[in-house]
From Swiss-Prot:
The keyword Transferase applies. Removes the 2'-phosphate from RNA via an intermediate in which the phosphate is ADP-ribosylated by NAD followed by a presumed transesterification to release the RNA and generate ADP-ribose 1''-2''-cyclic phosphate (APPR>P). May function as an ADP-ribosylase. This is Probable RNA 2'-phosphotransferase. InterPro entries: Ptrans_KptA/Tpt1, RNA_2'-PTrans_C, RNA_2'-PTrans_KptA, RNA_2'-PTrans_N. Belongs to the KptA/TPT1 family. Keywords: NAD, Transferase. SUPFAM superfamilies: ADP-ribosylation (SSF56399). The keyword NAD applies. It comes from Hyperthermus butylicus (strain DSM 5456 / JCM 9403 / PLM1-5). Transmembrane segments: none annotated. Its EC number is 2.7.1.-.
Amino acid sequence: MKPVYRCRVCSAYTEEPVHCGRPAEPLMTGEQRLRLSKLMTTLLRHLPHEAGLRLDPQGWVGIDELVRGIRERWRNRHLYQWVTRDHVIAVALLDPKGRFQLDLARGRIRAAYGHTVRVELGYRPLSMDELPDKLYHGTVAENLASILSEGLKPMRRLMVHMTTDYSSAVETGRRHGPNVVVLVIDPRCLAKHGIPVYRASDTIYLAPSVPPNCITGKIARNPQSARKTYLHA
């Protein structure tokens, strides 16, 4: 990830070393940013108790409480003594996938999606007019038979995750193995089946499940090249 700077003029967090015409103040290296982002994701989605955090029913926790938990309670806290409120806010604001939501007026933060701990995010179901034309979900060929038979299920998460960004779906699939398959999903089909679709960030959408007949296409990725192979739906 890119390093993060703070503008000496407007105080904005930025990935650019020059902002408002002046050299910006270094805040985090790219390595520090990546490590902190992964830790924040782990604590806010899956393991808040391991840093002594108590999420509210909607998944929010105080920013200062998160910083204290990381520095005082997390098992590898000796690696994170540099973390301050500014670092947490900067990671959240600059996250390229919108993984975090900030409520600075109340001094709190939460994960926008991806939870395995039970939370009620309170997102509004999208209307037909608000739905994108198609969504993608990354998986691997080994999972295709069960998916095409039973559909997509949340598994350990609370919701099925889909994206409007094809490359992000490929990246997700690669986490599960080399034989990546990107599923094409019709969100209007979900709505017609009474399955709500929620928007969690600019590119991430959620649904409780995806039945097989709402999967309209499959795109296989050759692990040795960038070539796409369109499979029969």
